[in-house]
Amino acid sequence: MNTADTRQRLLDIEKQIASLREEQATVKAQWEAEKELIHTSRRLKEELEDLRVQAENYERSGDYGKVAEIRYGKIAEIEKALEENNRKIEARQASGDLIMKEEIDAGDIADIVSRWTGIPVSKMLQSERQKLLGIESELHRRVVGQDEAVRAVSDAVKRSRAGMGDEKRPIGSFIFLGPTGVGKTELARTLAEYLFDDEDALIRIDMSEYMEAHTVSRLVGAPPGYVGYEEGGQLTEAVRRKPFSVVLLDEIEKAHPDVFNILLQILDDGRLTDSKGRTVNFKNTIIIMTSNIGAQLIQSEMEHLEGRDADAALAGLKEKLFQLLKQQVRPEFLNRIDEVILFTPLTRENLREIVTIQFNRIKETARRQRITLEISDEALMWLAKTGFDPAFGARPLKRVMQRQITNRLSEMILAGQVGEDDTVEIGLENDAIVMKKK
């Protein structure tokens, strides 16, 4: 970074500090004014109580003149002042500008508990109600073209938080079927972030690591005397530490059959006992299992899914996939799953939306380097067309955007062609992506 850039950065920081100091002065003045109002309210209440005690003492001693003077003079005057002071506090509270409160309420406690623990409070506040009502539209912002999956997951969460779900079982349990790259993992990640304000609330376990019988015990912990006993189970320990989470079991069809015995207990009772004898509560988790069962069948049916008989073809495909699933998974396990959801292959229209989502992520990364990215509609369309591969979903698109935008932008930064506060235009010329400094 050269001297001019350093000087400009220093000026920007000084302006920001000056702005923050001005904001601090305003907030401090407001805080002092509110503090004075609350202090006045307390003082007047104390004076009122003292005068009432005095009036009672004079009444017992028979001095009714003093009683009348206090009750109909001084007390009335202080009550009027207290009412006026309370009116000012209520006016600030109604406008939403109140910083301080004389008394804390249930909402304040709920907010602090949620902030400290990351656990949503049992009594739904108005803000949480709005958040839950908007869950479907929020999930649609990041997961494209999977309406049935988004609706099913949203309904399960709403049932649970409204108190209408089964209290003895997890919030929801789902099997996601579908080809690779269509949003199965992305939906789980988005759900964890939206519900618990933290992507780390997603507990992801790759079931291909549990293909052998001797590996199954690692889910609940090694038995006493075996290596790894002190570490706890990979599933139970993760949920014990984060009881409010989304549990993603990737590629469930690869797991050893004994794994389903463990999962059966979770789906039935909402709890599991680890190797140390501790009972782990799964009642506040969402269990999502993904599977690539029938991926080849889906690819072979692709041409029918985009035709006029798309709905009929999709219904037939679902039935075939369910039959394949029955061959891999025991009936008693499937009966305890809330829903088996088919993720449909992405269309060209879906990919256009995904291009915008992916580009916004690249744009945000560049913004942190103080570089602005702008892209034309033609370039977005070209990326969607080039990255479209029905067999592999959105993953080829991510590679195309990395190759065409991220890699080339990195080279421009390293070569000194682009620096802080610059704008880079991304367009299309001669059927190729071009990047120019504005």
Swiss-Prot record:
UniProt cross-references to InterPro entries, sorted A to Z: AAA+_ATPase, ATPase_AAA_core, Clp_ATPase_C, ClpA/B, ClpA/B_CS2, ClpA_ClpB, P-loop_NTPase
Keywords: ATP-binding, Chaperone, Coiled coil, Cytoplasm, Nucleotide-binding, Stress response
GO molecular-function terms, A-Z: ATP binding; ATP hydrolysis activity
Region annotation (C-terminal) ranges: 346-438
Record-linked SUPFAM superfamilies: P-loop containing nucleoside triphosphate hydrolases
Region (NBD2): 128-345
Keyword Hydrolase among UniProt keywords: no
Annotated family: Belongs to the ClpA/ClpB family.
Record's protein name: Probable chaperone protein ClpB 1
Organism the protein comes from: Chlorobaculum tepidum (strain ATCC 49652 / DSM 12025 / NBRC 103806 / TLS) (Chlorobium tepidum)
Top-level taxonomy: Bacteria, Pseudomonadati, Chlorobiota, Chlorobiia, Chlorobiales
